[in-house]
Amino acid sequence: MGKVKVERSEDADESVVASGDVTIKEEESYDDKLIFVNAIAKPMAGKKLAKKCYKLVKKAMKHKTFLRNGLKDVQTRLRKGETGICIFAGDVTPVDIMCHLPAVCEEKGIPYTYTPSRADLGAAMGVKRGTVALLVRQNEEYKDLYDEVKEELSALNIPV
């Protein structure tokens, strides 16, 4: 199942349930989002780990310099030596724009993971637009959650 979004629409299709003039469209499940994931999106965060990552992003968003988003910003921050946790979107096309970032993270010893949807990463930040890459730095206010996510990411098998 999932969350239910309410949209105003004239016509309805199979995935939309109509009730009067308001149609209710159900959000895609985690498994449905995995269909659109690229071949290089490994290690993929499980459902629970993805939820923890989104929660961490929400907490980091409250502090201005502790969350870096966007391909260009994350790329420059990694090159300049910032550390933290990298979260990448798995449904990016074309793949060539970000396929080098996992190698950079491995060189620098930064844990990283992929989540199924870039729209969900954007929603966790509180914006309507999706994002391709995030770099979350450690802060005292969410240290426990940060350490928990970092420990789970280091337990994931990084493909060679």
UniProtKB/Swiss-Prot annotation:
Its main location: nucleus. One of its GO terms (molecular function) is box H/ACA snoRNA binding. The keyword Ribonucleoprotein applies. It is found in: Nucleus, Nucleolus. The modification Phosphoserine is found at residue 15. The modification Phosphothreonine is found at residue 23. One of its GO terms (cellular component) is sno(s)RNA-containing ribonucleoprotein complex. The keyword RNA-binding applies. Component of the box H/ACA small nucleolar ribonucleoprotein (H/ACA snoRNP) complex consisting of Nop60B, Gar1, NPH2 and Nop10, and associated with H/ACA-type snoRNAs. Belongs to the eukaryotic ribosomal protein eL8 family. This is H/ACA ribonucleoprotein complex subunit 2. It comes from Drosophila melanogaster.
